[in-house]
Amino acid sequence: MATSSSVAAASKRGGGLYWALLSVPVVTFGLGTWQIFRKQQKEELIATLEAKLSKEPAALPTNPADLAHMEYERVAVTGTFLHDQEMLVGPRTVTREVFSGMADLPEAGVQVITPFRLADTGEVILVNRGFVPEAQAPPHKRAAGQVEGTVRLEGIVRHGESQTAFVPDNHPEQNTWYWIDVFTMASNRSALPVLIDATAECTPPGGFPLGGQTNITVRNEHLSYIITWYSISAITLAMWVFLRRKGGNRSGLRAPPPRRT
C-alpha cells in the first residue's frame, strides 16, 4: 500500500507534468497569434508594392539619395546606351510571367546591365535591360537589340542584390558578374549607384534583351500557419484536459481510501 509521502511525491510529479504539457497549447496559441500580425504586415507590404507599381512613371531624382525609399517605383529616363560597357550577369532564368506565350524560350541565360547616359544631366546610371539566352549573350549575336541614339525608357528602381552563400564572387577586373552589386558596378563604369530594370515595353525590336525581368515574389502563406498553430493548440489543449481528468483515477495519483475503524 502506498504511503502518504509516496502519494504526495507522485502527485507532485504528476502535477508538474501536467503543467509542462499545458505549455504546448499556450506556446502554439501564441505562435498562431503572432502569425496574424505577420499576415497583416505582409498584406500591407504587398499593397505598398502594388501601389508603387501602378503609379505613373516619375522623373528620376537628381539626387541618388532620394532613391533610398523608391525601390520598385516606376521612373522614366531619356538618354543613350553605352553598349561597349555592358555587363552580363548570370547564370539567370527568364521571368516567364511576362513572356508566357514564348514556350520555346531557353531557360538559361544572362541579364544585360548597360550604362545609360542621361540626356538632361550627362550623368551615367545603370539599366538592367533584361534577359538574353546564353547562345545570344555575345553582343554581335543580338545586334538588332543594340539600340543607338537617344531613347526614352521606363524602368523600375532597384537596389541591387545581396550575395548569398552559394553565389560566387564577382570579378570586375575580368568583367565577370554573378550577382548585381550596384555600387561596385557603378564604380567600375564611372556611373552613379543607380539601377533601374527596364520594363517589358522596352524590349527592342530585335527581341533581346527581354525587358520586364523584375521578379517580385512576396510569399504570403501566413493563413495556413495560423490554421496550423491554432489547430495544434486546440488539439493539445483538449488532450491536456482529457489527461488531467483521467489522471486523478490513476494509481499513485489518487489518495488512498480512508481506513475503516
Curated annotation (Swiss-Prot):
PROSITE patterns, per the entry: SURF1
Task: List the keywords (alphabetical).
Answer: Membrane, Mitochondrion, Mitochondrion inner membrane, Transmembrane, Transmembrane helix
Residue ranges of the TM segments: 17-37, 223-243
- One Pfam family of this protein, by short name? SURF1
Provide the protein's localization: Mitochondrion inner membrane
Q: How does it sit in the membrane?
A: Multi-pass membrane protein
A cellular component term (GO) from this record?
Answer: mitochondrial inner membrane
- Record-level GO BP terms: mitochondrial cytochrome c oxidase assembly
Q: Which family does it belong to?
A: Belongs to the SURF1 family.
Function according to Swiss-Prot or TrEMBL = Probably involved in the biogenesis of the COX complex.
Q: What is this protein called?
A: SURF1-like protein
